[in-house]
Amino acid sequence: MSRVGKKPVPVPSGVTATVTGQTVKMKGSKGELQFVVPPQVIVEFKDGAVSVQPKDQSKQARSLWGTSRAQVANLVEGVSKGFEKKLEITGVGYRAAMAGKALKLSLGYSHDIEYEIPAGITIVTPKPTEIVVSGIDRQRVGQVAAEIREYRGPEPYKGKGVKYAGEFIFRKEGKKK
């Protein structure tokens, strides 16, 4: 039994929810998002909340139940508040800057990396060693942050590279003489 799936997703004022068949659409101050619920799950909007139920008690339906409810909750939060991920850059000469509609990263390679910002995502660099990725779609914000981090992930000896804000990097000791 899904503990996550049991709870209905409350829709706050300022957000309009529309359920048409297996498609859930949310519209709020930040924008509009939609999610197609898997066919093993029933979704309905009543009393100002979206509830999700499994069609039957099969393992697959029960697995998708909690996942679908979490996806719908992410739609509500995305269109009302939005999501953001912060990245920190550590290392001598490592920096980030905005270059028009692209993010320019200097990460110790022989060339600078130009990262094209996808539609629906906003990237801000408050400091040369800080990147803030924001948007309404939680999955896309996380994906963009992961792609930027992948260019030079943090290494365990000196901790140089791109990491998420607050991420703990397991440090190793160098070799002994």
UniProtKB/Swiss-Prot annotation:
One of its GO terms (molecular function) is structural constituent of ribosome. Gene3D superfamilies: Ribosomal protein L6, alpha-beta domain (3.90.930.12). Keywords: Ribonucleoprotein, Ribosomal protein, RNA-binding, rRNA-binding. This protein binds to the 23S rRNA, and is important in its secondary structure. It is located near the subunit interface in the base of the L7/L12 stalk, and near the tRNA binding site of the peptidyltransferase center. GO terms for biological process: cytoplasmic translation. It comes from Methylorubrum populi (strain ATCC BAA-705 / NCIMB 13946 / BJ001). Belongs to the universal ribosomal protein uL6 family. Part of the 50S ribosomal subunit. Disulfide bonds: none annotated. InterPro entries: Ribosomal_uL6-like, Ribosomal_uL6-like_a/b-dom_sf, Ribosomal_uL6_a/b-dom, Ribosomal_uL6_bac-type, Ribosomal_uL6_CS. GO terms for cellular component: cytosolic large ribosomal subunit. PROSITE patterns: RIBOSOMAL_L6_1 (PS00525). It comes from the Bacteria. This is Large ribosomal subunit protein uL6.
